[in-house]
Design a protein with these regions (language model features):
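Juxtamembrane/interfacial segments at transmembrane-helix boundaries in multi-pass membrane proteins
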Residues: 16-43
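Membrane-embedded catalytic scaffold of the fatty acid hydroxylase/desaturase
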Residues: 4-14, 38-142
């Protein structure tokens, strides 16, 4: 239990750094391609977050250095929420880089935080054996 708490606490420390970097990118390097008042920006942000997350997760499976930090997530015998919560304590060092494109095109940090939270809820949902296969469009990519 205490190791699990540590693995959740360490990334929280990295959130401050991420917030500073994301804010700088959003304010100074933003290409301003999006009308942030439009509802479709929220949908685009959610889909873009999912795409960035997909590539981050895929690279963690294909690059040995990243796999070494990610493998703990796959060590459980059962596919459930406690297995999903097994995360590396060092991921905050590089995972944030994968989401920078969102800020470059103009997704505001507030929308990013919201869609990241929604994606986290989705990740809890797909990391359970109680939800069956949902088909290729929605189903789990790594089962």
């Amino acid at each position: 239990m205490s190791l699990g708490l540590i693995s959740r606490f360490v990334p929280l420390l990295g959130l401050g750094f991420q917030y500073v970097v994301y804010t700088i990118v959003a304010e100074q390097y933003n290409l301003k391609l999006l009308n942030t008042d439009a509802i479709w920006v929220w949908v685009l942000a959610f889909l873009m977050y999912d795409l960035c997350y997909y590539w981050m997760h895929r690279i963690h499976h294909e690059v040995k250095l990243f796999w070494a930090t990610h493998v703990v997530h796959h060590h459980g015998e059962d596919f459930n929420l406690s297995t999903a919560m097994r995360q590396t304590s060092t991921g905050f060092l590089w995972k944030w880089v994968f989401f920078l494109p969102m800020f470059l095109i103009g997704v505001p940090p507030a929308i990013y935080v919201t869609v990241a939270g929604l994606n986290l809820i989705y990740q809890f949902w797909v990391h359970t054996e109680h939800i069956g296969r949902l088909g290729w469009k929605i189903g789990r990519a790594h089962v």
